């Protein structure tokens, strides 16, 4: 098993933000939104009523934009710790004409200022692998979720060996530039395994059945707070 090698917590240069935004995340983002909406629908129809969603680690806001373009009947508070990402996110939100539906905020998701039980749903795509102590983020995301709400977190899954990692880079970033390939490689090294996520869920009192491997490179938590 590959050891976890941490990468920088914040991608806060203009080059990183622009390179990240230019990578083709469209298929992954569509699947994320499909699955998030399904999770809300399964939770007593949350996806069909106005609600406020918190997006942790929004990056350049591609997923909130995809969500709102599906005519989602709610709003999104989209957060990131990187100012450079939020600059690009603001441009993307304005270009999509979604300023009234998506609020961009600077947040450290390890220490959120929000009160307990603030949001109807919390979603996050690929923030966990950036965090040295991922339980800190997952604890906060669970805390700000209302009872009855849905926590939906998806992230990269660390492969078992270097050959598998190299295969994933070739498969999913083979046509990317050198910097983009480097970012993807480092993210895979920094990612958690499903068993490591389950250990954290036990500590937080969240069902371990809520996390599953959902692709050859992703795990997903889908949990309803009682």
Regions found by a protein language model. Name each.
Residues 110-121:
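A short acidic, Gly/Pro-enriched loop at the edge of an enzyme's catalytic core
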